[in-house]
From Swiss-Prot:
Taxonomic classification: Bacteria, Pseudomonadati, Pseudomonadota, Gammaproteobacteria, Vibrionales
GO molecular function per UniProt: structural molecule activity
GO cellular component assignments: bacterial-type flagellum; extracellular region
Complex formation: Heteromer of multiple flagellin subunits including FlaA, FlaB/D, FlaC, FlaE and FlaF. Homomer of FlaC is not able to form a functional filament.
PANTHER family xref list: FLAGELLIN
InterPro entries assigned to the protein according to its UniProt record, in alphabetical order: Flagellin, Flagellin_C, Flagellin_C_sub2, Flagellin_hook_IN_motif, Flagellin_N
Entry protein name: Polar flagellin C
Bilayer-crossing regions: none
Keywords from the named record: Bacterial flagellum, Coiled coil, Secreted
Secreted listed as a keyword: yes
Coiled-coil stretches: 317-347
A UniProt-annotated Pfam family: Flagellin_C
Localization per Swiss-Prot or TrEMBL: Secreted; Bacterial flagellum
Other facts noted in the record for this chain: V.parahaemolyticus possesses two flagellar systems: a single polar flagellum propels the bacterium in liquid (swimming), while multiple lateral (peritrichous) flagella move the bacterium over surfaces (swarming). The polar flagellum is synthesized constitutively but lateral flagella are produced only under conditions in which the polar flagellum is not functional.
């Protein structure tokens, strides 16, 4: 081996390995201090791209869970208000039944009606003041809202809220009033026993297309006016018949989803003088000062309660769906974060071993470099 002083190959080699050990030590210290084994694209370009994509998905899932919880909160707020509205209308129904009793005087019915009117005001107050985050929920202004319950576009759920104001036509129906009263001695004429009520857009034709729904009733011959009302009530849950004190028949038809004008026809309709121009009746229009009005109020309130109950059922289903969505989102986020951790996070057991190895190599390299720098001094002994 040649002895030279201009080029110290041994020192250069020792310095190269020392630099390598120092770089490895710095990398290990960076990974241990940051907690991530990928701190820049040079560490793992492909891994960084995958990790960033998983991070975006995880953060999106976190926001989606908050959105779903907001949806549950809105549904709970609206459903709680509807529960109170139901209690109000149940009380009004009790009053209507009480007012229908023949023992009540006009003054007593007037007092009952005043309480009913106060409850109508309370129902409207509930509808107008129930809000969430500044948005009114039950006065008809909310409409439909989309709740983003996923980390990607298109993963939304639509929630709709409708009005429960007392003057909403869906909170009631229409009433056909008879112009001719019948006494106890009257009986259904078998030649005029047919009655047909047509509800536009509530049925289907043979091809499954939207069509009118026809409720055909053939009354029993000889039935008096009260027996006729009882018979009509048993034919469909969409209609309710009652009789006033003067023997006049009134038929109430609930129509929350009817599109168009409801009509009535048939021999019985002509016999009783049932007008083909029904009166639209909502909770706002209830009048309990007469037996006829009280009887009609019962039917209107039954329709309104059914309508509100259907809205509450829909909100309950939405809440359950959102709860399951949150559980699913949490499960997805857990697995996404676990995958991201395997790609990006530092394995401390492995990295501390690497750091210890790099420290030893750095110390050894420093010592060897110091010795290698002394090798040219051996040339001086040849000059002595």
């Amino acid at each position: 081996m040649a002895v030279t002083v201009s080029t110290n190959v041994s020192a250069m080699t020792a310095q190269r390995y020392l630099n390598k050990a120092t770089n490895e030590l710095n990398t290990s210290m960076e990974r241990l201090s940051s907690g991530h084994k990928i701190n820049s694209a040079k560490d793992d370009a492909a891994g960084l791209q995958i990790s960033n994509r998983l991070t975006a998905q995880s953060r999106g899932l976190d926001v989606a869970m908050r959105n779903a919880n907001d949806g549950i909160s809105i549904a709970q707020t609206a459903e709680g208000a509807m529960n109170e509205a139901t209690s109000v209308m149940q009380r009004m129904r009790d009053l209507a039944i009480q007012s229908s009793n023949g023992t009540n005087s006009p003054a007593e019915r007037q007092a009952i009606n005043e309480e009913s009117m106060a409850l109508v005001d309370e129902l409207n107050r509930i509808a107008e003041t129930t809000s969430f985050g500044g948005r009114r929920l039950l006065n008809g202004s909310f409409g439909e809202a989309a709740f983003q319950i996923g980390a990607s576009s298109g993963e939304a759920m639509i929630m709709g809220l409708t009005s429960i104001r007392a003057d909403d036509t869906r909170m009631g129906g229409v009433t056909f009033f008879s112009e001719v009263g019948k006494g106890k001695d009257w009986g259904v004429d078998p030649t005029k026993a047919d009655l047909k009520i047509t509800l536009p857009g509530m049925g289907e034709d043979e091809d499954g297309n939207v069509d009118d729904l026809e409720i055909n009733i053939n009354a029993k011959a000889g039935d008096d006016i009260e027996e006729l009302a009882t018979y009509i009530n048993g034919q469909s849950d969409m209609i309710n018949a009652s009789v006033s004190e003067d023997g006049k028949l009134q038929i109430f038809v609930a129509h929350p989803n009817v599109q168009g004008d409801i009509s009535i026809s048939g021999g019985l309709a002509s016999e009783l003088g049932l007008s083909d121009e029904p009166v639209r009746t909502s909770v706002q229009d209830i009048d309990m000062t007469t037996v006829q009005g009280s009887q009609n109020a019962i039917s209107v309130l039954d329709s309104a309660l059914k309508y509100v109950d259907s809205q509450r059922a829909d909100l309950g289903a939405k809440q359950n769906r959102l709860s399951h969505s949150i559980n699913n989102l949490a499960n997805i986020q857990e697995n996404v974060d676990a995958s991201n951790s395997r790609i990006k996070d530092t394995d401390f057991a492995k990295e501390t071993t690497q750091m210890t190895k790099a420290q030893i190599l750095q110390q050894a390299g420093t010592s060897i470099l110091a010795q290698a720098k002394q090798l040219p001094n051996s040339a001086m002994s040849l000059l002595q």
